[in-house]
Amino acid sequence: MKRTFIMVLDSFGIGASADANKFGDEGADTLGHIAEACARGEADIGRSGPLTLPNLSRLGLGKAAEESTGKFPVGLDKNADIIGAYGYASELSSGKDTPSGHWEIAGVPVLFDWGYFSDVENSFPQELLDKLVKRANLPGYLGNCHSSGTVILDQLGEEHMKTGKPIFYTSADSVFQIACHEETFGLDRLYELCEIAREELTEGGYNIGRVIARPFIGDKPGNFQRTGNRHDLAVEPPAPTMLKKLVDEKGGEVVSIGKIADIYAHVGITQKVKATGLDALFDATIEEMKKAGDNTIVFTNFVDFDSSYGHRRDVAGYAAALELFDRRLPELMALVKEDDILLLTADHGCDPTWPGTDHTREHIPVLVYGPKVKPGSLGHRETFADIGQTVAKYFDLSPMDYGKNML
C-alpha cells in the first residue's frame, strides 16, 4: 500500500538562498535566528530557554540547516540519532510566495512573473476599484494600500463597521486582500465580493496570484481578530502537479488539510478538511492518516507559523509553535506504515527577526521518513520540484518536467 504524508511548515526557512540578495533577504535565516534569539533568552514569552526540537532533530533538521548555512542551529541536538533522510532545497520559482512554493513542491515551478501592486499608497488601479464598487454594489472602499493584516484592522475596522465599506489591501506578494467583519458585513457577502474580484483581476490581465478573504470579528481596535474562515482564490497551476497526476493516472486520493486546496485552486484535490490552529490541524492530519488507503496523499499546511508568527515578527510565538509541532510529531510518525513516506518541508521563509513583515527568500528543509527510507544526507536540492518528482516516482506516475528523484 502506497501512501505519502506531506507536512508543510509554512514559512519555515533554513537559511538565505544564493539569490536572496535580489529580494533584499541576504542573511535571512528563519530557523537560525529563532534559535539564536532563544539561546540569548530573548524568546521567553510563553516558553523559555534554548529552542528544543528533539524529534525534528532526529529527522535531520539540524544537519539540513548546517548544510544550508554552514552553521548548526544553536540549542538543537548535534548528537541526535538520525532516523530520516534530510537535505535542503533552493527555489527555482521567480517569487517567494505561497503558491509559487507549493506549486514547485508539487513539481510545477512558477517561471513567469506574477503581477504585483507595488505602490504603497493608492495601490490599486482606479478602473479596477470602480468595477468592484459597481458590480458588488458597494458604498465605497477603505484601505487601497500596503499593510499588515492585523494593523489595518486596528486602523480601519471601526470605520468599516460603521460604513459597510470593505477594506482592500495588498503586500509585497501577488495578492488582493479583502477584510470584512463577519457579522456586520457577512461572510457569504465577503466570499461573493472575492469571487467578483477574482473575475475582474483575471479578465483585466493583472496576473495576480491570489484574492484572499480576511474575515474578522470584534468591536473596537485592540480586540479585532481574524477568524479561521479565510478563503484564498488562486489561479490554477500552469501544468499538472503530481497531485493531479495521482488522481488522473491512478484514481488516487489527495486529502487537503488547511489551506492546501485553495492554494492549488482545488485542482488535483479529492477531499478537503478544514481546521484552524496547529493542534486542530494536527488532529485532522492524524484522523486522515488513520483512514488513508492505497494511492493516497494527505497534504497539510501548517499556516500559523507564517500568518501568526512570521509576518507578525513574533519570535517567541514562532519558537513555541515549533516546539508544539515537535512534541506532537511522534503521533504522526507512529502512523507511518512499512511502505509509507512522511515528508516535512516548507514553502518559503518568513524570518521573524527580519525588517518589515514580508516573506524571506530562503532554502527549505526536506525531511523524509519511512521504514524503507535510508537515513542520511540528501544534500542540496536545486529545486523544490525534487519533492514532486520523488512523489511521482514513488506512485509510479508519469515523470514531472522538473526535479530529480531523491530516493
From Swiss-Prot:
GO molecular function, one term: magnesium ion binding
Gene Ontology CC, one term: cytosol
One of the GO biological process terms: nucleotide metabolic process
Alphabetical UniProt keywords: Cytoplasm, Isomerase, Manganese, Metal-binding
Pathway: Carbohydrate degradation; 2-deoxy-D-ribose 1-phosphate degradation; D-glyceraldehyde 3-phosphate and acetaldehyde from 2-deoxy-alpha-D-ribose 1-phosphate: step 1/2
Annotated cofactor note: Binds 2 manganese ions.
Residues annotated as binding Mn(2+) 1: D10, D347, H348
Annotated catalysed reactions: 2-deoxy-alpha-D-ribose 1-phosphate = 2-deoxy-D-ribose 5-phosphate; alpha-D-ribose 1-phosphate = D-ribose 5-phosphate
Gene3D superfamilies listed in its UniProt record: Alkaline Phosphatase, subunit A, Phosphopentomutase
Domain of life, source organism: Bacteria
EC number: 5.4.2.7
Free-text function comment from the UniProt entry: Isomerase that catalyzes the conversion of deoxy-ribose 1-phosphate (dRib-1-P) and ribose 1-phosphate (Rib-1-P) to deoxy-ribose 5-phosphate (dRib-5-P) and ribose 5-phosphate (Rib-5-P), respectively.
Cited HAMAP family: Phosphopentomut
Family named by the database record: Belongs to the phosphopentomutase family.
Name under which the protein is recorded: Phosphopentomutase
Species of origin: Yersinia enterocolitica serotype O:8 / biotype 1B (strain NCTC 13174 / 8081)
Gene designation: deoB
